[in-house]
Amino acid sequence: MTRTRRLTHIAIYVALALVLHITESFIPVPFMVPGAKLGLANIVTLLVILLSGMYDALVVVALRTFLGSLLSGALTSFAFSIVGGVLATIVMALVYKRLGGVFGLVGVSILGAISHNIGQLLVAGVVVGTMGVYGYLPVLLVAGVATGYFVGIAAGLVLRFLPKALAESAAAGWPEDARVHHIARMR
């Protein structure tokens, strides 16, 4: 892949993740744990890990986290989000690469969501300066399983329909990415 094409893909991934991040702020989720979110932008992160690899996914997470914090005016949450996002991305990429066949897409996503919550909790422990915040861990683990399951299912649905959409765009003159077809066949 050329440098320009890679940069274009990253820009598209960041834009998609930002749209999902901003959209999520408008979705009322009354049953969620305080501080927990669905993590819709992580659908893109998971797809980038599969389609482009861990390093591109880390770039997407860093840019999406910074721009999302900037656009939402919540710069104080940047430290929480970046640590959680980077930890989740690394865990998902490593688990997918080494144990993807064992865990599947949903399992990888659940482990990523749990890692994200643990990363944020570590930052909270440093910021607050007390071990008391770690009492929140069991609640965040349950929330991580639920949100990770949702994100994994959503990413799986995207992967199911992505090859068809790419094939149609190739027929219309757009270049086709064979890696997407390979991943879709692995599912």
Where are these regions (language model features)?
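Hydrophobic transmembrane alpha-helices
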Residues: 1-48
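Alpha-helical transmembrane segments of multipass membrane proteins
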Residues: 17-21, 68, 88, 92, ...
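Membrane-embedded alpha-helical hairpins and interfacial helices in multi-pass inner-membrane proteins
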Residues: 74, 78-79, 98-187
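Generic transmembrane alpha-helix motif of multi-pass integral membrane proteins
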Residues: 38-54, 91-96
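Hydrophobic alpha-helical transmembrane segments
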Residues: 7-12, 43, 47, 55-62, ...
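Interfacial aromatic-anchored transmembrane helix boundaries in multi-pass membrane proteins
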Residues: 21-38, 63-93, 105, 127-132, ...
